[in-house]
């Protein structure tokens, strides 16, 4: 049985979970994640303590607990378990308070709390823009895009666009490159005026064939030779047009998004 990991927070737990994933990914081990958000009272802290102790009995080993609890009383209750408790405040915030000689707000995940902030509104606007301009659905207002992702079908354009919008408030459109474009030897007409905003995604042809076969098994669309043709043509077109691009084959969405932001020199803070 994989080790149990609790993500305990008095809010959504997004910050704690992101941190936990970053740390746990360093180990070649599967983990069973148990999310415990909104622990905003001592009663809920005691209920969480009970869950942790139950896991100890069931697993025969102590679990790992990542916590971002602001309330010291609730935090002490959770720390009363026999688990390995990793307190993000104690580990990182308190030493920074001493170094900076300042008291922190002790409000983990502040950026997620106020739905009326300008940043929140910008993010929602970016998400709506990316959804409206997914897969070339609309050519309207392409001039408003921060970036336009191009590439063959199933090369990772849609998830990357949405990740950029949700995490960074980037207005990311995406547009497919199709066989008709390769036959003409030109970019799709609606994109011609926006070369400076374009960024390309490619992918290993064999991997592309596997992905497409999940969607349309046995089709020409998914055939290895067709995938090789489309990728070769797409990469040749991007080189001709001076479009920066990368292969998404062995990269996570986070890595792809970070590279795009660096390449197009767009400075945005993650929400």
UniProtKB/Swiss-Prot annotation:
Q: Which Enzyme Commission number(s) are listed?
A: 2.7.11.33, 2.7.4.28
Question: Do the record's keywords include Repeat?
Answer: no
GO MF entry, a single one: protein serine/threonine kinase activity
UniProt KW keywords? Kinase, Nucleotide-binding, Serine/threonine-protein kinase, Transferase
- In this chain, ADP is annotated as bound at 151-158
Q: Give the top-level enzyme category.
A: transferase
Q: What is the recorded name of this protein?
A: Putative phosphoenolpyruvate synthase regulatory protein
In the record, the note on similarity to other proteins reads: Belongs to the pyruvate, phosphate/water dikinase regulatory protein family. PSRP subfamily.
Q: Tell me which PANTHER family the record gives.
A: PYRUVATE, PHOSPHATE DIKINASE REGULATORY PROTEIN 1, CHLOROPLASTIC
Keyword Kinase recorded: yes
Report the catalytic activity.
Answer: [pyruvate, water dikinase] + ADP = [pyruvate, water dikinase]-phosphate + AMP + H(+); [pyruvate, water dikinase]-phosphate + phosphate + H(+) = [pyruvate, water dikinase] + diphosphate
User: What does it do?
Assistant: Bifunctional serine/threonine kinase and phosphorylase involved in the regulation of the phosphoenolpyruvate synthase (PEPS) by catalyzing its phosphorylation/dephosphorylation.
Alphabetized InterPro entries for the sequence: Kinase-pyrophosphorylase (IPR005177), PSRP (IPR026530)
Q: List the disulfide bonds.
A: none
């Amino acid at each position: 049985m994989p080790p149990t990991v609790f993500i305990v927070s008095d809010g959504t737990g997004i910050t704690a979970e992101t941190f936990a994933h970053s740390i746990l990914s360093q180990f070649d081990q599967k983990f069973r994640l148990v999310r415990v958000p909104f622990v905003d009272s001592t009663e809920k802290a005691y209920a969480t303590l009970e869950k942790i102790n139950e896991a100890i009995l069931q697993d025969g080993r102590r679990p790992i607990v990542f916590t971002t609890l602001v309330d010291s009383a609730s935090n002490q209750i959770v720390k009363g378990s026999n688990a390995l408790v990793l307190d993000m405040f104690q580990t990182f915030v308190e030493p920074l308070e001493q170094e900076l000689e300042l008291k922190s707000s002790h409000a983990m995940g502040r950026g997620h709390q106020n739905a009326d902030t300008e940043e929140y509104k910008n993010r929602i606007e970016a998400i709506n823009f990316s959804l409206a301009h997914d897969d070339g659905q609309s050519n309207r207002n392409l001039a408003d895009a921060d970036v336009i992702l191009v590439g063959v079908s199933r090369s990772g354009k849609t998830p990357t666009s949405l990740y950029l919008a949700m995490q960074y408030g980037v207005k990311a459109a995406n547009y497919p490159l199709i066989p008709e474009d390769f036959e003409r030897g030109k970019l799709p007409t609606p994109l011609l005026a926006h070369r400076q905003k374009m960024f390309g995604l490619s992918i290993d042809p064999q991997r592309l064939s596997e992905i497409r076969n999940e969607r349309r098994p046995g089709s020409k669309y998914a055939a290895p030779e067709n995938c090789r043709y489309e990728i070769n043509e797409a990469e040749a077109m991007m080189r001709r047009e001076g479009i920066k691009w990368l292969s998404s084959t062995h990269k996570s969405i986070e890595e792809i998004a970070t590279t795009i932001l660096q390449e197009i020199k767009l400075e945005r803070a993650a929400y």
